[in-house]
Each structure stands twice: as structure tokens, then as C-alpha cells.
Amino acid sequence: MLEGIIRESTSKAETKKLRRDGYLIANIYGKGQENINAAFKTGDFIKYLRNKEHLVFPVKVGDKEVKVVVQEYQKHPVTGELLHVDLLMAQDGVKSYYHVPIKVKGTPIGLKNKGVLIYHRRRIKVKAAPENLPDFFELDVTNLDVGDNILIRDIEMPEGVECFLNPSIPVVGVIKAK
């Protein structure tokens, strides 16, 4: 489980000091819940996120243990270093918007016909309660030829999960290489 500290002060000087000491600044918030200003060791946070298996993961801040989802993050424009992360509390029974990642399986037929697999979207925004939330959407791309796409409407949504995006938006496709 990922462990962090509660930030007592939210001043600019205190934030800079924490970043210098190797901490990642985080805000944890949720519907009807009090915001928690936290900080995590940057290396531990990145390592944990790369190896996590589920979209929703537990964190311990001070003596509080909450289930969260990464909602938004900020990177340094030059170095690409992670500066700040917003974590949304995943409360059972409360529907919220989440960005669910896309994973593809198989090799498209179109790659043999001088095509290239293109991701139009890496994540799909859905509204669901955390208990119904899929960890990812797996798309089978083996039958895609040059010019074919998988659209939002082609994705099977689990029960209790709603997608409000335009159904004709492409997610992945194969285009002709130039």
C-alpha cells in the first residue's frame, strides 16, 4: 500500500521544500468529503503506479486509509518530472467520472498491407460507481484492415457503466503508412 504524509501547510515555501526533499504534492478529494492535502515520495508513487493492477488503489495518509483514482497530474514542461497529482476518492455507491485505459490484443491484418495501428484515444471517459468500474477496456484488433476503426459504440460497456461520448468517435484504427 502506498503511504504518504499530510501536509500541515500549503504555502509555496513549504511546497518547494517538500519537492526538494523528493516528495510529490497531492490533493485527495471526493464528493461530500473533506479535502486532504498530502505528499508522497515521488519514486515510491511512480513505482507503485507502474505496477498497480487496478484503476482504483488504496493509499494511507496519516492514519486515514482511502481508495483513490488518479484524476489529473502535472508535469514540469522542460524536465518532464511529475510535480502534482489530483486523486479522487472512490466511494462505494457514488457514481463519478473516470478515465479507463484502452488495451489492444492481437495483430491487425492491416499491418501486413502496409498499415499502421493508431490510437485515437488512450482512455475513455465513463461514469460509474467504483465497484462496477473496469480496470481497462480490451479491444481485439486482429480483424482490422487498412481504413478500419473500432468506434466507441463497438465497445461492450459493463453493467452500471455509462459512456457519454459520441458513439461514432474512433478509438483505435489502422491507417495506410505514408
Swiss-Prot record:
Pfam families named among the record's database cross-references: Ribosomal_L25p (PF01386), Ribosomal_TL5_C (PF14693)
Q: Which domain of life is it from?
A: Bacteria
- Give the signal peptide, or none: none
In its keyword annotation, does this UniProt entry include rRNA-binding?
Answer: yes
One term under GO cellular component: cytosolic large ribosomal subunit
Q: What CDD domains does the database record attribute to this sequence?
A: Ribosomal_L25_TL5_CTC
Gene Ontology molecular function, alphabetical = 5S rRNA binding; structural constituent of ribosome
Q: Which GO terms describe its biological process?
A: translation
* UniProt keywords, alphabetically: Ribonucleoprotein, Ribosomal protein, RNA-binding, rRNA-binding
Q: Is this entry keyworded Ribosomal protein? A: yes
Record's subunit section = Part of the 50S ribosomal subunit; part of the 5S rRNA/L5/L18/L25 subcomplex. Contacts the 5S rRNA. Binds to the 5S rRNA independently of L5 and L18.
Q: Which family does it belong to?
A: Belongs to the bacterial ribosomal protein bL25 family. CTC subfamily.
State its role: This is one of the proteins that binds to the 5S RNA in the ribosome where it forms part of the central protuberance.
Q: Which HAMAP family match?
A: Ribosomal_bL25_CTC
The protein's name: Large ribosomal subunit protein bL25
Q: Which organism is it from?
A: Nautilia profundicola (strain ATCC BAA-1463 / DSM 18972 / AmH)
Traced from the root, the source organism's taxonomic lineage reads:
Bacteria, Pseudomonadati, Campylobacterota, Epsilonproteobacteria, Nautiliales
Gene name tied to this protein: rplY
